[in-house]
Amino acid sequence: MPRRKALTNNNNAGEAEQQPPKAKRARIAFHLELPKRRTVLGNVLVCGNGDVGQLGLGEDILERKRLSPVAGIPDAVDISAGGMHNLVLTKSGDIYSFGCNDEGALGRDTSEDGSESKPDLIDLPGKALCISAGDSHSACLLEDGRVFAWGSFRDSHGNMGLTIDGNKRTPIDLMEGTVCCSIASGADHLVILTTAGKVFTVGCAEQGQLGRLSERSISGEGRRGKRDLLRPTQLIITRAKPFEAIWATNYCTFMRESQTQVIWATGLNNFKQLAHETKGKEFALTPIKTELKDIRHIAGGQHHTVILTTDLKCSVVGRPEYGRLGLGDVKDVVEKPTIVKKLTEKIVSVGCGEVCSYAVTIDGKLYSWGSGVNNQLGVGDGDDELEPIVVVSKNTQGKHMLLASGGGQHAIFLVKADKQDQKENVPVKVSGSSSISKKDKTPPQDNVDKEAENVDKQEQKENLPAKASTSSKKNKTPPQDNADKEAENVDKQEQKENLPAKASTSSKKIKTPPQDDAAEEVEEESAQEPTPKKAKKPAAKRGGKKT
């Protein structure tokens, strides 16, 4: 007999068919807010070599052994040192520049004699929130999220141009149609973070610092030439979360994921300056996941990296020569982040020159260490300092240091201004047009303003994360080594040192920082660096780019 067909419950089947499909989870869009402009007013100080006007003290001042004030910049709130130029951001969002303008890094007309060596305003289509300077380029983030840049990038063959069209002597919109929230400059590359958590890179890629090109393409000799180098392009990491913070050293790029807090790094690693192994290779062409944790800020020079963690401690990694790591008489490469033990106080800000380093304490004390050949350390002599030393000067005595930034042969500092200083700093010019945003948004990381209120509402803004808010008042110790007495003793010496140098004899006194030729060093890392020599020509640094 034929089998009977199984009976089906038509009612149940109908109910199943009528059930609505499961609702899809709404994807929450990742979004970073624009940062706030710094608010603590400061005075600009400089030291080092000024052979191309990077000291901002006029054509006749070619050297400063100690920190000297720069006039004509009112209400300064942020600074950035390039290779041979500087940017200063004011409270109102204007930008002053001074120094070498051979390739347009100043972003303004300097056809008038002596105009490079004195601070002057850059004409921008809006007000700036933050600034960054490289060897020959400059950039800023405006209040509406646009990124403007000017100048040029360079590689081992020389000038690359800022875009495929060449150098740009005035600011141009580099990321049209994209809202950005952070920028960071290396020597010859620029890193940009968008509000969507995406990272874009542009510039020289010879050391892998762009993190997105093949070994054949990094030199610009591929099928597409330099087009892929000079057009901001997204750096994509498979399975990585959106990013919330970026940093750049001379030849490296660092990024932090928003959810995992993982730090990714790409670029030159011949002295382990990425703080991670690259399996025998000199550089990382694409980002590698590091073991760095709890990072507040990262700075670096040619072959070393300075790391500031959220517990306000300073660590270093990389090449030790000339004392740039601050660890004493160390001979071997430091492959893992090592705490600088001489910095016993809480550190709130770090900076680097090519072969030197700086740290600012919660009490506003400035430390410097490394190569002193160009007087970048600001301690009054040209000696190298193997360990951190307190910088003592009549221009910093009794004042609170805020920021430090090192260039190729000079350094720039921001010291908190008092009421009298603010009256004396009268604006030279009125800024151009602006597009001021009505709402200043809080940055996604290092919420400086809120943290500062927990430390000291009057003096410690922008200098401390929330976890350390209860300890600041107890840590205000007087400068070491009787700083007040030292400052009095150096006053007379500074008066002698601060006499204008004669142009006819200045070339004999100009010193050049130790040039770290990475290509040769990789082959012979154990070999000692030659003793730094004095420069014969001011433009010596404009040669081919060294790796």
Swiss-Prot record:
**Which positions bear Phosphoserine?**
526
Per the record, where are the segments of Low complexity compositional bias? 427-436
Q: Where is the composition biased (Basic residues)?
A: 533-547
| A GO molecular function held by the record | guanyl-nucleotide exchange factor activity
Its cellular-component GO annotations read:
condensed chromosome; cytoplasm; nucleus
Acidic residues: bias regions: 517-527
Cellular localisation: Nucleus; Cytoplasm
- The segments labelled Disordered in the record are 1-24, 423-547
What are the Phosphothreonine sites (modified residues) in this protein? 286, 512, 531
* The Bj1 repeat ranges on this chain: 417-454, 455-489, 490-519
Task: Tell me which UniProt keywords the record has, alphabetically.
Answer: Cell cycle, Cell division, Cytoplasm, Guanine-nucleotide releasing factor, Mitosis, Nucleus, Phosphoprotein, Repeat
Where is composition skewed (Basic and acidic residues) in this entry?
Answer: 437-464, 482-499
| One Pfam family it belongs to | WD40_RLD
Q: Name one GO biological process term.
A: regulation of nucleocytoplasmic transport
Q: Which domain of life is it from?
A: Eukaryota
- Function description: Promotes the exchange of Ran-bound GDP by GTP. Involved in the regulation of onset of chromosome condensation in the S phase. Binds to chromatin.
The family database entries (PANTHER family) matched by this protein are listed as: REGULATOR OF CHROMOSOME CONDENSATION
The protein in question is named Regulator of chromosome condensation
Q: Look up and give the organism this protein is from.
A: Drosophila melanogaster (Fruit fly)
UniProt lists the gene as Rcc1
